[in-house]
Amino acid sequence: MKALIPKYAVLPLALAFAVNCAAYFGARLFLGNTSYHHMTLPIDSIIPFVPAFIVVYLLAYVQWAVGYIMICRDSRQVCYYVMGAEIIAKCICFLCFVFYPTTMVRAEITGSSLFETAVRYLYEIDAPNNLFPSIHCLESYFCMRGAFISKKLSGWYRMIMILAAILVFASTVLLKQHVVADMAGAIITAEFALWFARKTHIDQWFAKINFLERRPPQ
């Protein structure tokens, strides 16, 4: 039976996860008494607070798991290319978090419904920093772009990834976890990272260092 995660994908996934943790949690070590910037736009005040979207926000983790596994199973080249771009993007996120830290005013939760209680808990465990660019949006965008980079994934799967990405993007602003600028920053960061990874042939670099790669017999 074919492994869920190919052996050649283990190292790229591990590196991507490590860099993600370093960028997100490590950046907070540098903040301290930092002055924060606000990137709220007029449109952000128009967007309503919809607690029910906490379901979509949490289900994003399922999309990421499925999306990255499918990307890694596609081929070595696609796996190395997308995961390399993912690592580049997280390095950019780290720089933004440290050198241009942003924050926002979150929604005032007065109710006690299940959804409102869940959002209140989210607010308590996730401080309003490390916002620009939005990692939540970044991950969903990479899953969607990876579906189109792949030559093997079907049209219906791509449509599902598009819909999932749209819903996740919407959830970040409807829960007042992010502002519109954070979403735009995620797209720009991802596209730049994909471009840079392609220009630098990062897939070839991964092929050289990946000691776990299964090489076909000569």
Question: What do these predicted ranges mean?
Answer:
Residues 144-148, 190-198:
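Hydrophobic transmembrane alpha-helices
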Residues 107, 111, 128-132, 167-195:
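Interfacial helix-loop-helix junctions of multi-pass membrane proteins
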Residues 29-42, 72-156, 204-218:
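Membrane-interface loops
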Residues 63-67, 140-145, 163-171:
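Hydrophobic, membrane-inserted alpha-helices
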Residues 1-64, 119, 217-218:
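N-terminal transmembrane-helix/juxtamembrane module of multi-pass inner/ER membrane proteins
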Residues 8-16, 80-85, 157-161, 181:
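Alpha-helical transmembrane segments of integral membrane proteins
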Residues 21-22, 90-96, 163-174:
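Aromatic-anchored segments of alpha-helical transmembrane domains
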Residues 56-63, 135-139, 184-188:
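Membrane-embedded alpha-helical segments of multi-pass membrane proteins
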